[in-house]
């Protein structure tokens, strides 16, 4: 049953280009389908978060992460009486703007773009769905509903000035009310993202042998999860014990968000989606106690996983790839693909616009393509050793 504070697909604020409605799908379902069928979504298969693609097929990619986020987001939306399709849509779209090599790639591209308006993956996601996807006859982008665009832009909360240039450009023709909070559906998608990455970073870190289950069993929340498993399944083998404990950890996070959200909703008694946006605070969030426990876990992961020697070495290598490719294309835009060269011709002589085109191009690369592009354009041998301003070995 749809709650009074849920977004109503039949009362959407519409699309930038008016289209005939579908007889079989709601506006939010059409948004979801357009995202799934987009080029940017397919490329997430070969974009990673912590481990570069070649390090193993087992580790999460942006695509598998987005699917996990969508699954838990939809479940929580159903429990809270929200529109499941809008929630799923924002969840599937939330990582579209990430460049290759995860947060390392974004850090590198952000530094390079600082003189030209900066780089932000949420703003880039909005740019992708409003401009860079060019497949439809009547419009650039995907022509998504206002509610989906709002969710992409501010699922993490209100956006204050100065705005990233990509967000400012995308919002030039549509007012997404950036000073307010997003819908409850978008807020659920944001918390689902937090739940998914906290869970799978622990899982991937164990798989990479960066820490042990004994170490995890001493951390907040996880201590109770392992104890519950040991009590119910004494003598359980290592892999099943690990899985059961992390499964319980996942459940604890979901239940905390739902309980906290129900309490907040009871307090403010919202009667419309606008009441959620104008509440002045996020309605969907972790409880203070659990959030503090998660900070302890994130500190542990930062030290033991994100700053592990093997990961730091990888970060240095892939940072160099982005730092090499960006000036190369600035100086040699003729090496861009044909469709991108047309954009360069349209901004002839404008250094800032050229940099933004190069940024758009690099941010759309997958890990694999960026490495291959670097090897082909900057230099490298068939054995995987990439040469140029630095010597990088990406191995097998």
Swiss-Prot record:
SMART domains to which the protein is assigned, alphabetical: HDc
Keyword field: Hydrolase
Pfam families, alphabetized: HD, HD_assoc
Domain HD: 62-198
A biological process from GO: dGTP catabolic process
Gene Ontology molecular function terms on file: dGTPase activity
Keyword Secreted: no
HAMAP family: dGTPase_type2
Similarity comment text for this entry: Belongs to the dGTPase family. Type 2 subfamily.
Matching PANTHER family: DEOXYGUANOSINETRIPHOSPHATE TRIPHOSPHOHYDROLASE-LIKE PROTEIN (PTHR11373:SF43), DEOXYNUCLEOSIDE TRIPHOSPHATE TRIPHOSPHOHYDROLASE (PTHR11373)
UniProt protein name: Deoxyguanosinetriphosphate triphosphohydrolase-like protein
Record organism: Jannaschia sp. (strain CCS1)
């Amino acid at each position: 049953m749809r709650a009074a504070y849920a977004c109503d697909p039949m009362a959407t604020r519409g699309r930038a280009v008016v289209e005939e409605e579908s007889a079989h799908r709601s506006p939010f379902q059409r948004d979801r389908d357009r995202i799934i069928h987009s080029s940017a979504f397919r490329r997430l298969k070969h974009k990673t978060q912590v481990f570069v693609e070649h390090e193993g097929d087992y580790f999460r990619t942006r695509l598998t992460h987005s699917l996990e986020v969508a699954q838990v987001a939809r479940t929580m939306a159903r429990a809270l009486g929200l529109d499941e399709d809008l929630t799923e849509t924002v969840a599937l779209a939330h990582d579209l703007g990430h460049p290759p090599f995860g947060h390392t790639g974004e850090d590198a591209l952000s530094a390079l773009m600082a003189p030209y308006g900066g780089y932000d993956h949420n703003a880039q996601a909005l740019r992708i769905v409003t401009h860079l996807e060019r497949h439809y006859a009547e419009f650039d982008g995907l022509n998504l509903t206002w509610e989906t665009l709002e969710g992409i832009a501010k699922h993490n909360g209100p956006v204050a000035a100065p705005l990233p240039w990509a967000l400012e450009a995308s919002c030039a023709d549509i007012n997404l009310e950036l000073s307010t909070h997003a819908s409850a559906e978008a807020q659920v998608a944001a918390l689902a993202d937090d739940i998914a990455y906290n869970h799978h970073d622990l899982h991937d870190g164990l798989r990479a042998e960066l820490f042990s289950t004994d170490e995890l069993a001493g951390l907040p929340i996880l201590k109770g999860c392992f104890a519950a498993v040991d009590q119910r399944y004494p003598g359980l083998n290592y892999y099943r014990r690990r899985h059961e404990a992390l499964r319980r950890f996942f459940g604890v996070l979901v239940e905390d968000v739902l309980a906290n959200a129900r309490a907040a909703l009871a307090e403010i008694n919202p009667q419309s989606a606008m009441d959620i946006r104008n509440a002045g605070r996020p309605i969907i969030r972790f409880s203070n106690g659990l959030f503090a426990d998660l900070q302890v876990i994130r500190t542990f992961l930062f030290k033991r996983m994100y700053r592990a020697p093997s990961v730091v070495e990888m970060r240095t290598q892939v940072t160099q790839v982005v730092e090499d490719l960006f000036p190369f294309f600035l100086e040699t835009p003729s090496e861009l693909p044909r469709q991108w060269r047309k954009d360069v011709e349209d901004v002839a002589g404008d250094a800032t616009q050229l940099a933004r085109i190069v940024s758009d191009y690099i941010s759309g690369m997958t890990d694999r393509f960026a490495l291959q592009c670097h090897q082909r354009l900057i230099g490298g041998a068939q054995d995987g050793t990439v040469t140029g301003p630095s010597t990088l070995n990406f191995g097998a």
